[in-house]
Amino acid sequence: MGDARDLCPHLDCIGEVTKEDLLLKSKGTCQSCGVAGPNLWACLQVTCPYVGCGESFADHSSIHAQVKKHNLTVNLTTFRVWCYACEREVFLEQRLAVHLASSSARLSEQDSPPPSHPLKAVPIAVADEGESESEDDDLKPRGLTGMKNLGNSCYMNAALQALSNCPPLTQFFLECGGLVRTDKKPALCKSYQKLISEVWHKKRPSYVVPTSLSHGIKLVNPMFRGYAQQDTQEFLRCLMDQLHEELKEPMVAAVAALTDARDSDSSDTDERRDGDRSPSEDEFLSCDSSSDRGEGDGQGRGGGSSKAEMELLISDEAGRAISEKERMKDRKFSWGQQRTNSEQVDEDADVDTAMASLDEQSREAQPPSPRSTSPCQTPEPDNEAHIRSSSRPCSPVHHHHEGHSKLSSSPPRASPVRMGPSYVLKKAQVPSTGGRRRKEQSYRSVISDVFNGSVLSLVQCLTCDRVSTTVETFQDLSLPIPGKEDLAKLHSAIYQNVPAKPGACGDSYSSQGWLAFIVEYIRRFVVSCTPSWFWGPVVTLEDCLAAFFAADELKGDNMYSCERCKKLRNGVKYCKVLCLPEILCVHLKRFRHEVMYSFKVSSHVSFPLEGLDLRPFLAKECTSQVTTYDLLSVICHHGTAGSGHYIAYCQNVINGQWYEFDDQYVTEVHETVVQNVEAYVLFYRKSSEEAMRERQQVVSLAAMREPSLLRFYVSREWLNKFNTFAEPGPITNHTFLCSHGGIPPNKYHYIDDLVVILPQSVWEHLYSRFGGGPAVNHLYVCSICQVEIEALAKRRRVEIDTFIKLNKAFQAEESPAVIYCISMHWFREWEAFVKGKDSEPPGPIDNSRIAQVKGSGHIQLKQGADCGQISEETWTYLSSLYGGGPEIAIRQSVAQLPDPESLHGEQKIEAETRAL
């Protein structure tokens, strides 16, 4: 796409254009084939009235342009203008500016340009440079950029549009660009940041081509290679996992200790807890999770001076646009005006995942505050629930992806572990770490901060009443769609969960056309007007949640192995939400696979646009004060289990309107259209009026500009949380500080991207309200960290040089007396450390994976073990540094053979002895 400032030389060919003419033509049909809209194209050539269909039909508009040499055409749905000769979008406002300077034949009748161009009122149009900020926000909101289909890539486009309209995540990439740093390939976070910047930039194109991100995701997961349609939910999980992996940072040790303490407290309680809680009250199933949490979007600011607020924000052009609109919305709220659903969604969405910050801050003795006890203090629970033994909190289902790399269907079959009602019991045992005795590091990222929640799962033995608990982290909830009988049981409070398998949707999708759309619309209208006894009860999202969290009896083939009874017993498993995420991702399991066939559950599930209350599903231990959510975006799948097409419906954060994102086409729709869609994935955001009032107060303080003697540095990332989260948690300055209170040497050169300077009055207010810290008035490089870094680099250099030297000598030895074996699992950890890929050294050498003990007690190498061979000197060197074992020698010293003469003499004596 060409830039909006580039002038198309073919603009002189345009006839007189009015908005009324275009609206009239949009109600017509293609003059070649008679098909109706949407997305008809009108020729803009002088005196040419032609209207043709687009690429979704026979593309007669392009044929007309090629035959008649009429270069300019306008889309009658989006009102964007395309030049076939220049092969890019053009902007008619620039034509006016040029032609008014030099007399134009077609505009010579006008002495001055009209007050507003006919196309200017269309919300999707790109703003002129000369337009005021408010006019740009009101008439031409950002973020309405389509995405080109790269070949059955609608699953990716719909997912990216839904994420793009999640303010906490988007604002992080727009305003905290300095934190988007990684040395991990394929640097997907960089591709995503670039894509978001293009989509939300003031001079955005009509659509973007997400080639870089598509290429990166294919490198990460081979399942997405080729041109087969894939499941948008699987894509979301894979994308967020990779973003977390690239952006994750180690958590402060004190935070991890608090997490462990919290988890141990909730583990293996007995009947006393059972007396306080009913099975249905605390039940939980294995949720479908994905990556971690993220930070946010620049919304939800308080009303006040624009300059004052800029002290709290990065001066990024795209970020300012979103912030300005939110200030307007906050002012409207403070005046007591009634707001639309969409406005509430924009502002009221903060996150209790800010608890990650809370934990980090708790190591500082700070004054307590109501907001500092945000429930999501589990950045990444290091709990005994060992749901995640790895550093990132991704669900095991991601390993399952590889098994479907050859599938051509839309939603690949998900692992049972991810499925809501059909879960697998997990014992509270420490996962094997392959002999790595060092403390496993906990990590957090913007993904985990935004999307991570946790659930408390309890299993009760019905014989001894023992209750064991497990904490699991989730990033999305995969909910079953209950049938008529299930609904009746649910409403009777005796519902039993029924396993359901999410399935696959097709490779390709041919347009359903207007007839199918009208038939479906009429069907839904008739259903809504017909008594429920005829069609059956209406399924709501709350019903799906109730089905997911209903108690599950463990009996028959699924009996519970009770550790107290030491045998299989009947039991009950139940769960509740322990920590609410800022952005709640809900996945409705519409695809099911049987042995011989697959099918799609097309039941309409009604869902609220605002006010989704999760209080009925919260655990007693949950401390979140914000429990209601407003809808941000919906991903829909049209078609069957064999073929289909994905589109997204998203609410624009700037004007509060709903839009349909169908690949490169973006169309405004009414909220009633959104309520009637067949939802597949929904994104909800926390809503909090208190958070908006808090932002307004901070902006007012900043606007006063009271003189102060001290300046305070605050983490830009935490400030972004404050602007976009409902519960940002305590102030977290550890994102730019080391454990000694200084700046880590590797962050000092871009420290300006990590901090924001606040006046003393603002800092004191935030500190008294949220706690945390520590207070920072001076930035300096930490000398202790510098010494440690130099010592660590020297240690790595010595170890790797010594190993290379000893290994060379081993390779040169023709017949070594003894060869030692070492576990490749441990060796890879050591190699990652000495090469600088891992900051922590490995634990003691652990050869238990490759060793087996014979009856005599002799240790031998296990058959087919993953091991490497090293010399005795190398083993001695590594063992002296790290310890561990056991020693495994596969070729020991051989005793010296007797000389031939003595051997011959012995044989002669033996022969004579036998003769006698």
From Swiss-Prot:
Its EC number is 3.4.19.12. The keyword Transmembrane helix does not apply. The modification Phosphoserine is found at S112, S132, S134, S306, S369, S410, S415. GO terms for biological process: antiviral innate immune response; endocytosis; negative regulation of canonical NF-kappaB signal transduction; positive regulation of autophagy; protein deubiquitination; protein K48-linked deubiquitination; protein K63-linked deubiquitination; proteolysis. Interacts with VHL, leading to its ubiquitination and subsequent degradation. Interacts with CCP110. Interacts with DIO2. Interacts with HIF1A. Interacts with ADRB2. Interacts with USP18. Deubiquitinating enzyme that plays a role in many cellular processes including autophagy, cellular antiviral response or membrane protein biogenesis. Attenuates TLR4-mediated NF-kappa-B signaling by cooperating with beta-arrestin-2/ARRB2 and inhibiting TRAF6 autoubiquitination. Promotes cellular antiviral responses by deconjugating 'Lys-33' and 'Lys-48'-linked ubiquitination of STING1 leading to its stabilization. Plays an essential role in autophagy induction by regulating the ULK1 stability through deubiquitination of ULK1. This is Ubiquitin carboxyl-terminal hydrolase 20. It comes from Mus musculus. The gene is Usp20.
